Amino acid sequence: MIRVIFLDLDKTLLPEYDPEPAIPIVEELKKKGFEIVFNSSKTRAEQEYYREKLNVKGPFIVENGSAIYIPSNYFPFEVPGVKRGEYMVLELGVKVEEIRKALKELEAEYGLKYYGNSTDEEIEKFTKLPKHLIPLAKDREYSETIFLWKREGWEKDLIRKGFKVTMGSRFYAVHGNSDKGKAAKLLLDLYKRVDEVESYAVGDGENDFPMFDVVDFAFLIGDLRHENAENVTSIKDVLKKI
């Protein structure tokens, strides 16, 4: 039996941006025998930073389900995808260049601010990111993050152009027709080729809802509600239940 847990990062595993408080959580999950899979709106570069700090080695899902990064030779069979460095990458989203082209057409009309048209100083102000993490957040491949807008309607225009707009813990994300659930299910199907699987997911935002629909046990931090998820106050509560 393989036990897999999908973890959102912001406001779920990470109270803020410091990985230190998450170390005992990750260690406890390892002791319980879990395969830990980050499933976050964060970029590959950001997730690699936290993977290193937290010593997490398995696959991870980036930018709201836009791509799955699987370490080479992780599964005992060939994984379909694009070879990129030490990973096989299963791409489910669209390239960020396509998204930014659409945003460029709308930014003047709606006063949009996002990574692609913001300075490092503006990004620091919007996100409260530590300076050393800003380049990692800017290294986007499949999505953009909307920080500010001056009037409503931009979401509908982007949806009409074929993109998805989802709400995370802090900001709206713009990406292709991908979500955390589609990516999680695809990865679970690969695990099931190895052995029986028991699956879990923990998140705190609306963009986590799709992954709650594809796992056996789901936990929702905070006051939102989802029919397939049990509400908890923090990830520490989850450790007591699994």
Curated annotation (Swiss-Prot):
This is Mannosyl-3-phosphoglycerate phosphatase. Belongs to the HAD-like hydrolase superfamily. MPGP family. It is an enzyme of class 3 (hydrolase). One of its GO terms (cellular component) is cytosol. PANTHER family: HAD SUPERFAMILY HYDROLASE-LIKE, TYPE 3, PHOSPHOSERINE PHOSPHATASE. Its cofactor is Mg(2+). One of its GO terms (molecular function) is mannosyl-3-phosphoglycerate phosphatase activity. Pathway: Carbohydrate biosynthesis; 2-(alpha-D-mannosyl)-D-glycerate biosynthesis; 2-(alpha-D-mannosyl)-D-glycerate from GDP-alpha-D-mannose (MPG route): step 2/2. Pfam families: Hydrolase_3 (PF08282). Hydrolyzes mannosyl-3-phosphoglycerate (MPG) to form the osmolyte mannosylglycerate (MG). It comes from the Archaea. Keywords: Cytoplasm, Hydrolase, Magnesium, Metal-binding. Mg(2+) binds at residues 8, 10, 169, 204. It catalyses: 2-O-(alpha-D-mannosyl)-3-phosphoglycerate + H2O = (2R)-2-O-(alpha-D-mannosyl)-glycerate + phosphate. The active site is at residue 8. Its EC number is 3.1.3.70. The gene is mngB. One of its GO terms (biological process) is mannosylglycerate biosynthetic process. Coiled coil: none annotated. It is found in: Cytoplasm.
